[in-house]
Amino acid sequence: MRQASVLAPHTNGPTVTAGEILVEIMATTVGDGFLEPQTLIGPFPSGAPAIFIDQVARCGGTAGIIAAVGDDDFGRLNIERLRRDGVDVSAITTIADRPTGSAFVRYRENGARDFVFNIAHSAASETRMTDEAQALIEKAGHVHIMGSAFAIAGIGAIILEAVKSVKARGGSVSFDPNIRKELAQGDEGRRLIDDLLAVTDLLLPSGEELQAASGLDDEEAAIEKLLAAGIGEIVLKRGANGASHFSRAHGRIDAPGLEVEEIDPTGAGDCFGATYLTCRRLGMRPGKALVYANASGAHNVTKRGPMEGAASLAELDAFMAAQLSEEVL
């Protein structure tokens, strides 16, 4: 049983992730799917790893991503957004004969969403360990793992190599197990999750993901099992109800959500996790980091487009102040 782990400070090197970059194109009307011509808006830069790493940079952290895009405008708009916001894009490869990934999204009347994805056959599937990717890994102080990235050929191996390298230098790892519970029930999926949990310093699950990670349905028992295994911090995302921090060092800390009008929830969890991680790596205590993370997720859902709600800490301060003023009035 390993000792409870801690997050590497920002001075150890940048936060690095690997995974899909895509564009999101959204229907402007509510309805069922894409079976008839309709008005669309976009393209917006997207992809969970890209949203996450963009928010790390917006919060003041050093950040880089290993990914692949097509030689097209969809790829260029993503690279330019990430570069503008301060992300190291040197390890993003341009693939000449594959398009940048895409996701078409339409909301139903009940709030559910219909998606049409092109990821498996996009440039993302050609992500490889290049010299630039290796150089980025060698200077990294922290690796963020997106569970969904393991569904894309080649990316899982890059992540595992990055974890091995960074851990050997005293760095740390965060893990967003954005995986469905049933995927964790097979032997291979369960082994992968257990291997990732064994190196995780910060776990960022939602409710169902907590069950998938722990194998337990009871929240309290699941948290205790994971902390006992040596994970330093668990931050449980509760959506509009806020979030909870659990650790041996600080116990349980709950932070309420902010009441906002939801425009587009895509990317809110990624912004939340990126903000919490970056605040902690910058030396902020868990309770304060949790407040900023909740604000980040809430701010993100008020904008149309998954990366359009990314915000700096100063912008989140202003957002929270405005929310407080509205409550007082």
UniProtKB/Swiss-Prot annotation:
Biological or metabolic pathway of the protein: Carbohydrate metabolism
GO BP, sorted A to Z = galactitol metabolic process
The record's EC number reads: 2.7.1.101
Superkingdom of the organism of origin:
Bacteria
Q: What would be an example GO MF term here?
A: tagatose kinase activity
Q: List the induction conditions.
A: Up-regulated by growth on D-altritol or galactitol.
Database matches in Gene3D superfamilies? 3.40.1190.20
Instruction: Give the observed phenotype of the deletion mutant.
Output: Deletion of the gene does not result in growth defects for either D-galactitol or D-altritol.
Q: Which reaction does it catalyse?
A: keto-D-tagatose + ATP = keto-D-tagatose 6-phosphate + ADP + H(+)
Q: Which UniProt keywords apply?
A: ATP-binding, Carbohydrate metabolism, Kinase, Nucleotide-binding, Transferase
**Protein's job:** Involved in galactitol and D-altritol catabolism. Catalyzes the phosphorylation of D-tagatose to D-tagatose 6-phosphate.
Query: Which family does the entry's similarity section mention?
Result: Belongs to the carbohydrate kinase PfkB family.
Give the protein name, as stated in the record: Tagatose kinase
Species of origin reads: Agrobacterium fabrum (strain C58 / ATCC 33970)
